[in-house]
Amino acid sequence: NRTLQRAFPHPPMRLREREQVAWLSQTMARELDMDPDLLRFDFQDDALSPAFNVTAVQSKEISALLTLAQTLNVRIAAVTPDACALQRLLPFIPSGRQCLVWRDESQWLWATRYAWGRKSAREATTLHDLAATLSVVPEHISLCAEGEFDPWRAVTVRQPPVPPDGYRFAIALGLAIGEIR
């Protein structure tokens, strides 16, 4: 997992957005013992507490992507970690569920309203193992799988043919939906 998620309490004084960015950059760099210029991050206010939820990555982790985009004259507005894309499907999971999970051969990707992440399949071999590591009741998890949650529910108008094994497209559909505000 090469991204870092942390919550940082708001600073004691009120700051404008540019000052918030500078303050968070310095705070993250100090916490990680890194040069602030080596970090890329995004943040949002925590809805439940006076804090910022920050997602950060080392610049080197995305430098190849940025170089390729520049070569192709593509302007990148945002880089979205794969598990984060699952958050965009949360409004479509059944009532009473609070976590959406997708799995391939090597990893679990998961998202709740306030957090997201990845666990290797070695760390959590079953859905119950994953639920335990996330401190979530298994019955509150929707799994993107055949006979379980179908991410195509998020698409109101579908043109046939819809691919079989639609659950495999959860990340792509989450990215395509974009940010829901």
Mark where each language-model region is:
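Hydrophobic/aromatic-enriched cytosolic interaction surfaces used to assemble or bind macromolecules
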Residues: N1-R181
